[in-house]
Amino acid sequence: MQSLFSNKYKFKDTEEKLNAYWDKIKLYKWKNLQGKQFIIDTPPPTISGQLHIGHVFSYCHTDFIARYQRMLGKDVLYPIGFDDNGLPTERLVEKIKKVRAADIDRKEFKALCNEVSAKFRMEFKILFQSLGISYDWDLEYHTISEEIQKLSQMSFIALYNMGKIYRKLQPIFWDCADRTAIARVEVEEKEMSSFMSTIAFSTEAGELINIATTRPELMPACVALFFNPLDIRYQHLQGQYAIVPIFGNKVPILSDEQVKIDKGTGLVMCCTFGDELDVYWWNKHNLNTQIIISKSGTLDLKHNIAETDTLSGKLHGVSIVEARKLVLETLSKCNLLIKKEEILHNVKCAERSGMPIEILLSNQWFIKVVEIKHELLEQVRKINWYPQSMRKQIEMWIDGLNWDWCISRQRYFGIPFPVWYSKRDNEEIIIPDVNELPIDPTETLPQGYSKEEVEADVDVMDTWATSSLSPQFNSIHTGINSIPLIPASLRAQSHEIIRSWAFYTILQAYYHHNSIPWENIMVSGWCLAADKSKMSKSKGNALIPNQLLQEYGADVIRYWAANSRLGSDTVFSDEVLQLGKRLVTKLWNASKFVSMFVSQCQIPDLNCVTETMDKWVLTKLYKVIVKATESFNVFEYCVALDYIESFFWKDFCDNYLELVKKRAYGESVTNKENLSAVNTLSFVLMALLKMLAPFMPYITEEIYSTLYNNGSIHDHDNWPVVNTSLCNEMDEQLGEDFIEILNQVRKIKANAQLSVKCKIYKLIINSENYDFPTSWENDLKAVCNAEHIVQDKRTSYYNDKFLISVQFAN
């Protein structure tokens, strides 16, 4: 008998061949089959540079589900988009083209962004195709395209008309490095070293009081001092005024419950603005406003300057860090610096630039969030979260929100606000008709207005304001409005964007459709570097997928990605890649063995299965199909793979292939026994290939097409059916007893340092009242290489069900 397979699996040849084949037959094309939809809201990767293996990690997770659902018979809508507008793309362009957006013409810079974006989109596409990600590329989109710009601007106008969007001068988070407003979600805390300085203030009455602060440079912006009303040390100061040292401004002393009695001196400055608590006090107590930080991150004290040689004159125009140093030096010279203590503390920084943020007053666009927190929590609880623990993250985020979503950005490459500001009397904001969209107000005029009568809004929208409409993108690109694409079946994403992408999408779906955006959300963890830190190109610990694909092939990379618990961070592991490589080799070799017999039964006939051990392996297979199906149905791909792989190695390869060889070859067995073996081999391998196909699409397709010649393994309705006729509990127990005896025989031979092929003259089985079927005995003789099996049915006084002894032929 001859195998249909070469000695070694050549993954590079196979992947190239199958990618062309799948593309030719449009395997992943969405067919719009009514009633069988499975719609995936796909995360559009940001065009910010090369993808590393950490990005590949989560994109594979989504693909496992897409392939499984397709094999279940679902019509899977699996689009791919690219998030190529906004600051990340700008930064990439500035780095590659060695330009600064602020230094060149806006149109010229946007053209460079489009050029670079197109190049990286193509690179991403090639990588995703190399990984076997089963996107429908006919549904590709990118967020700076005219179609998406139109949708985003339509969303803005709809929300504006609903009264859910407003423009206002109010405190916002400001990134001085990128010179733009940012949203609360783009702020992260970093531990930094600083100084806690205790400074001597005085009241108008001349009483000395001490303030502890990490930001002495904000003293010119001090508008009040606060103490806790329960703090008896300062109750007598209520209603008095304090003099800010070296600057001389007079500020009220007030009480508020938010002051921590045991922090610092218990008496704190309120400046406009040092932090969010300052904003809270400013609003609550209707305090004055004294803004001294410019948008470039320098001190702006021109209104405080009387003479150029004053301290204010020296501070004007210098950086925040330098100003802090100068103020402390001056306080020290004036004997007003009581104490200066080095500390480590958390500082709010911009997520993108990594620089400390400031809170400034600025006119920005906002989407209302705070007033509908309760409604948003209700929406969150209508969605199935996998894992369930991830829901708590977004609930805590919503509970803690006290700022609306700032959606305007002072950048260049983004979607413009479709807004002009009228200079005519009694007019403020001009909004175009939706039929005119997309528009750039800096390049066009509203109908009936001259350029002297309007001022264009030059800001662009927060990238999330567009990508949070991703469920709606599906409707645009399918051209289908007759079926509901919201809620989608699944959103798949990683955990660090729960507060941004997940939250904003829930918000947009609620406002626009009064619906949840998806029925289920599957949340992946991070792929961590060897030192358990997040992979990052800037840290130099990110692995490039193309190198690993060349070395291991796509199936091994996908296997590695599948070996991560849903929602859990996973350390990148060469060991897991080696396990994947070993699995590919073993699957190829096992299939090579089975291929010698499959020609007899290309379509396996289970009516031919008569032998006990064949029924045993079919029962084990049935239970694996049930468990894998149940796991996939709740998006636990890792658990499904664990069940499948355990069955493949332990039950199929280690035991069944060994015990069935003699019958498969037809050596000294009846035709019935032979047919039972080859039909079982063929059926079990086919089911294994199908269950492994979502994880390892290339090798499973290659083996399946070679052996069974029955279309693609990834076709609809190709997932193994849960067939109860496969299950026979009695035969399963007989099989388990068989394996127990076999393992004891193997152990005896190993202890005697004999080959597993060493011939046994007599295999003696001590058991209590046990009758073995003839087919069972024949298989046991074959696999143990035993000439005779003798049963000793005396009453057993051993703990084990069987006591095995052997007499070797020699």
UniProtKB/Swiss-Prot annotation:
It catalyses: tRNA(Val) + L-valine + ATP = L-valyl-tRNA(Val) + AMP + diphosphate. Its EC number is 6.1.1.9. It comes from the Bacteria. A motif ('KMSKS' region) lies at residues 534-538. InterPro entries: aa-tRNA-synth_I_CS, aa-tRNA-synth_Ia, Anticodon_Ia_Val, M/V/L/I-tRNA-synth_anticd-bd, Rossmann-like_a/b/a_fold, tRNAsynth_Ia_anticodon-bd, Val/Leu/Ile-tRNA-synth_edit, Valine-tRNA_ligase_type_2. SUPFAM superfamilies: Anticodon-binding domain of a subclass of class I aminoacyl-tRNA synthetases, Nucleotidylyl transferase, ValRS/IleRS/LeuRS editing domain. One of its GO terms (molecular function) is aminoacyl-tRNA deacylase activity. GO terms for cellular component: cytosol. ATP binds at K537. Gene3D superfamilies: HUPs, Isoleucyl-tRNA Synthetase, Domain 1. A motif ('HIGH' region) lies at residues 45-55. It is found in: Cytoplasm. GO terms for biological process: valyl-tRNA aminoacylation. Pfam families: Anticodon_1, tRNA-synt_1. ValRS has two distinct active sites: one for aminoacylation and one for editing. The misactivated threonine is translocated from the active site to the editing site. Belongs to the class-I aminoacyl-tRNA synthetase family. ValS type 2 subfamily. Monomer. Catalyzes the attachment of valine to tRNA(Val). As ValRS can inadvertently accommodate and process structurally similar amino acids such as threonine, to avoid such errors, it has a 'posttransfer' editing activity that hydrolyzes mischarged Thr-tRNA(Val) in a tRNA-dependent manner. PANTHER family: VALINE--TRNA LIGASE, CHLOROPLASTIC_MITOCHONDRIAL 2 (PTHR11946:SF93), VALYL-TRNA SYNTHETASES (PTHR11946). This is Valine--tRNA ligase. It comes from Ehrlichia ruminantium (strain Welgevonden).
